[in-house]
């Protein structure tokens, strides 16, 4: 798979293009291949150093771009690499099946769990089918149905958050978008099973929160979580969406800042260059964190679990 490089990654892209060109020559270069091996090794070392330098000092706007990277792993990628025996469940049993939300039963290290997450889609056709990862009310009601099923069968719930926000169309509003989100918030706060929420890309406003109330909230290293997009914030504050970089810095939407404010619990590391550089390693990092947290939560009885979650939610806004 050829990688898409972001604007701030252009120096890395140029170096990697040179390395690939030399590899092609080396494969067909006969006697010159030995000399090229040394040059390739030097360029690879230089590329690694450049990546380490760039990714050690990313700004909030650059992180926001990484969170939206078109090759970033989505919910179905984590289902493939971190879980086994996934059985998808469809429909809200009231109106329709919203493809922007995927969910079903799976096993995590052999333990039955319910997995629910946003799914954006890769190709144009899939993006349209999945509405670019922006759920309608029926998507959130499907998620609610799966959560209630999980509670009935005493299965922990794992959610993956990656959406620009809930779909704001007229039809969605007519079918009760705000009610669907609000009901999910209420029900998730009172579920008697462990709930672990993970922001893996964009965590956009109520559309993210609707599957984001839990006992642990984790963020991948280069994900974002905010009430509005940087472009939207810039358009409101400065009437200029080009000021999105300044807005991103002011909003505090990156994982380290949110952990400092105690709005999230853990930051899950990504491979150098971002999750899309090594989705399998990212999924393994995610799995390790989920297994660890699930073991901790399973030590609590129902009453203690609910009290812990209540205290966690009530602590928001206090430093």
From Swiss-Prot:
Catalytic activity reads: N(6)-carboxybiotinyl-L-lysyl-[protein] + acetyl-CoA = N(6)-biotinyl-L-lysyl-[protein] + malonyl-CoA
- Which Enzyme Commission numbers does its entry carry? 2.1.3.15
The pathway that the record names for this protein is: Lipid metabolism; malonyl-CoA biosynthesis; malonyl-CoA from acetyl-CoA: step 1/1
Q: Name the keywords, alphabetized.
A: ATP-binding, Cytoplasm, Fatty acid biosynthesis, Fatty acid metabolism, Lipid biosynthesis, Lipid metabolism, Nucleotide-binding, Transferase
Query: Record's GO cellular component, any one?
Result: acetyl-CoA carboxylase complex
Q: What class of enzyme is it?
A: transferase
Q: Which residues form the signal peptide?
A: none
GO biological processes = fatty acid biosynthetic process; malonyl-CoA biosynthetic process
Start and end of every CoA carboxyltransferase C-terminal domain?
A: 35-296
Subcellular localization, as worded in the UniProt entry: Cytoplasm
Report a single Gene Ontology molecular function: carboxyl- or carbamoyltransferase activity
UniProt record similarity statement: Belongs to the AccA family.
On subunit structure and binding partners, the annotation says: Acetyl-CoA carboxylase is a heterohexamer composed of biotin carboxyl carrier protein (AccB), biotin carboxylase (AccC) and two subunits each of ACCase subunit alpha (AccA) and ACCase subunit beta (AccD).
Describe its function: Component of the acetyl coenzyme A carboxylase (ACC) complex. First, biotin carboxylase catalyzes the carboxylation of biotin on its carrier protein (BCCP) and then the CO(2) group is transferred by the carboxyltransferase to acetyl-CoA to form malonyl-CoA.
This protein's name: Acetyl-coenzyme A carboxylase carboxyl transferase subunit alpha
The gene designation is accA
